[in-house]
Curated annotation (Swiss-Prot):
Residues 389-400 have a biased composition (Basic and acidic residues). One of its GO terms (molecular function) is promoter-specific chromatin binding. Component of the prc2/eed-ezh2 complex. It catalyses: L-lysyl(27)-[histone H3] + 3 S-adenosyl-L-methionine = N(6),N(6),N(6)-trimethyl-L-lysyl(27)-[histone H3] + 3 S-adenosyl-L-homocysteine + 3 H(+). The lineage of its organism: Eukaryota, Metazoa, Chordata, Craniata, Vertebrata. This is Histone-lysine N-methyltransferase EZH2.
Length: 760
């Protein structure tokens, strides 16, 4: 690399020239490195092939080859064509064999590669044309401007077209580091000029001795500056931004350079990453930071990580649970429980002899846990009442006292087993009581992992300190309570339960919902053209009025919405006692499947592992598809055949594929129209299902104006999904057809043969 002289230019034009020259140099070096890697890999593979060939040659030399005996053909038959094989080795005799002509075999239809899917897959829009499709000379002759129009749809962006405009993260960092040398060289020139001026002034004023001292001081300062690596100048990022405007502004490039250089440091964590709570580097962080990965990666609509159906849709961070575990045990868990701890700022002590006397007395109360409010200072009894149930619990340390018999040991074993199972399912129920040691708790320090875990659990169990202590495992409820008091300013209180307002009855809720449907004039045929994608609404403490996104999109509020459970726009489900396959069912009328969380009487929530369910309106979400066979079609290309008989209106399969936007579907559709093969299916006004690259076998079902199947877009747990149903009774082995809803001109263009109708 050739650097400029000491008196180099410093204007923006010069920096642009430097960016271009360094970029071309780095691209060339990368190309050379890639060529060297290919050469070395080719040489290595070639060497392995030669070594393997030598081994095989040695094995063949040790073997004795025996000739293959061929039966002599009958030469008396006329018209028989013979094939003669002569060998150059004396060990092999001349071989003559008759030729047999094979009949022509029909070739299989053309099929483009595709990836099988069992559910829809959301993908981003492709803003760059990855490859220019080959259409054949005939299509290009008919429409020579097709390729140009296709490139215009992608704003002229073609992968690999702009060789000089390509810059990835690796080249970007190398380019900044290379340009930083120019910046350092300019600063050195300025410092040298400044130092020379100071030296001349000091020689004239203070003499040689003072000048030497100042020289040593300045040289030491320059040495220290060289030891610390400086951040690149803003001129570098301004020049790169001017050369590559699509990569971002100057500030964005600076932030990107910081992130990339920090990631290259040893032991560096990704941005917004909290150390493992079980690792040695665990830190004490807030609840939001501990749950950041959970809120980012966990889909609250599918209840799984890395959801492919909602990866680009932000979901609310809080999900309202109906049964929130904010109830606290009214009984203390032991004599050292936090309930006995503080009254008027003083710690109350109890004699140790109280526990054995109480423990020896059998309890007449039931062993079931009662839940109530935390007793306050006014309602707390003056004397502790500890029964046998509280003897072996988390704050009672007298577990090994005399007087315990074999029955107590058996009870302890059962409690320990129950504790381990409850800790594994802490989100479902409050953990049962855990036996700890007999010594009173001492003031101990909280580690970062324990403090972070406490802040996570306090948002679920609130003031149930006994349960939180059992989940943490290393702290007692008394210590948890003390830590809670210290952090009372940053932790939310438990939500108050309004016991005076009774819950609205189910029948009244359905009646109000029916009135609401009549107000918005719900169409019973479900043929509305305005079908929009559902997004959960999130407007706290505000009703779902005209500003609500669900009301604006003419969608019902679902269970994922953050609005009140009494919202008049919230779909309440059905109360059917039948099969939910008629318009008497509100779910069937609204063209949606029964929700197992809402429809509790029709059987949608029962027998989840079985296909024999009373509700017939939950087949898509259960995946109750039929067995389909792929074979060449009598109409066109490949077809799909059914292996089992199907009744009318019975679910056959779901039409799966990539979920793309309407704009992306328009760009892809222009290419598919030229191929005269399209797998696009409108899902709603926002998205389209494309089964060209990814899909399931139902994608091979052909078009017919007299089909035996029909497609229906249904709302399934907040998502639009396409179901294929039987239009009539279908026998085993029949090919499946449904109407693509082509226009008459498109039907003649794309479908050349109509299937033969069965004669009744």
């Amino acid at each position: 690399m050739g650097l400029t002289g000491r008196k180099s230019e410093k204007g923006p034009v010069c920096w642009r020239r430097r960016v271009k020259s360094e970029y071309m140099r780095l691209r060339q070096l990368k190309r050379f490195r890639r060529a060297d890697e290919v050469k070395s890999m080719f040489s290595s593979n070639r060497q392995k092939i030669l070594e393997r060939t030598d081994i095989l040659n040695q094995e063949w030399k040790l073997r004795r080859i025996q000739p293959v005996h061929i039966m002599t053909p009958v030469s008396s038959l006329r018209g028989t064509r013979e094939c003669t094989v002569d060998s150059g080795f004396s060990e092999f005799s001349r071989q003559v064999i008759p030729l047999k002509t094979l009949n022509a075999v029909a070739s299989v239809p053309v099929m483009y590669s595709w990836s099988p899917l069992q559910q829809n897959f959301m993908v981003e829009d492709e803003t760059v044309l990855h490859n220019i499709p080959y259409m054949g000379d005939e299509i290009l002759d008919q429409d020579g401007t097709f390729i140009e129009e296709l490139i215009k749809n992608y704003d002229g962006k073609v992968h690999g077209d702009r060789e000089c405009g390509f810059i990835n993260d690796e080249i970007f960092v190398e380019l900044v580091n290379a340009l930083n040398q120019y910046s350092d060289n300019e600063e050195d020139d300025e410092e040298d000029d400044h130092h020379d001026y100071k030296f001349e002034k000091m020689d004239l004023c203070d003499g040689k001795d003072d000048a030497e001292d100042h020289k040593e001081q300045l040289s030491s300062e320059s040495h220290n500056n060289d030891g610390s690596k400086k951040f690149p100048s803003d001129k570098i990022f301004e020049a790169i931004s001017s050369m590559f405007p699509d990569k971002g502004s100057t500030e964005e490039l600076k932030e990107k350079y910081k992130e990339l250089t920090e990631q290259q440091l040893p032991g560096a964590l990704p941005p917004e990453c909290t150390p493992n709570i079980d690792g040695p580097n665990a830190k004490s962080v807030q609840r939001e930071q501990s749950l950041h990965s959970f809120h980012t990666l966990f889909c609250r609509r599918c209840f799984k990580y890395d959801c492919f159906l909602h990866p680009f849709q932000a979901t609310p961070n809080t999900y309202k649970r109906k049964n929130m575990e904010n109830l606290v045990d009214s009984k203390p868990c032991g004599i050292y429980c936090y309930m006995y701890m503080v009254q008027d700022g003083m710690v109350r002590e109890y004699p140790a002899g109280v526990v054995p006397e109480r423990a020896k007395t059998p309890s007449k109360r039931s062993t079931g846990r009662r839940r109530g409010r935390l007793p306050n200072s006014n309602s707390r009894p003056s004397t502790p009442t500890v029964n046998s149930e509280t003897k072996d619990t988390d704050s009672d340390r007298e577990g090994g006292a005399d007087g315990n018999d074999s029955n107590d040991k058996d009870d302890d074993d059962k409690k320990d087993e129950t504790t381990s199972s409850s800790e594994a399912n802490s989100r479902c129920q409050t953990p049962v009581k855990l036996k700890l040691s007999s010594e009173p708790p001492e003031n101990v320090d909280w580690s970062g992992a324990e403090a972070s875990l406490f802040r996570v659990l306090i948002g679920t169990y609130y003031d149930n300190f006994c349960a939180i202590a059992r989940l943490i495992g290393t702290k007692t409820c008394r210590q948890v309570y003390e830590f809670r008091v210290k952090e009372s300013s940053i932790i939310a209180r438990a939500p108050a339960v309004d016991e005076n307002t009774p819950q609205r009855k189910k029948k009244r809720k359905h009646r109000l919902w029916a009135t609401h449907c009549r107000k918005i004039q719900l169409k019973k045929d479900g043929s509305s053209n305005h079908v929009y994608n559902y997004q959960p609404c999130d407007h706290p403490r505000q009703p779902c009025d005209s500003s609500c996104p669900c009301v604006t999109a003419q969608n019902f509020c679902e269970k994922f919405c953050q609005c009140s459970s009494e919202c008049q726009n919230r779909f309440p489900g059905c109360r059917c006692k039948a099969q939910c396959n008629t318009k008497q069912c509100p779910c069937y009328l609204a063209v949606r499947e029964c929700d197992p969380d809402l429809c509790l009487t029709c059987g949608a929530a029962e027998h989840w592992d079985s296909k024999n369910v009373s509700c017939k309106n939950c087949s898509i979400q259960r995946g109750a598809k039929k067995h389909l066979l792929l074979a060449p079609s009598d109409v066109a290309g490949w077809g799909i055949f059914i292996k089992e008989p199907v009744q009318k209106n019975e679910f056959i399969s779901e039409y799966c594929g990539e979920i793309i936007s309407q704009d992306e579907a328009d760009r892809r559709g222009k290419v598919y129209d030229k191929y005269m093969c399209s797998f696009l299916f409108n899902l709603n006004n926002d998205f389209v299902v494309d089964a060209t690259r990814k899909g399931n076998k139902i994608r091979f079902a052909n078009h017919s104006v007299n089909p035996n199947c029909y497609a229906k877009v249904m709302m399934v747990n907040g998502d639009h999904r396409i179901g294929i149903f039987a239009k009539r009774a279908i026998q085993t082995g029949e090919e499946l057809f449904f109407d693509y809803r082509y226009s008459q001109a498109d039907a003649l263009k794309y479908v050349g043969i109509e299937r033969e109708m069965e004669i009744p």
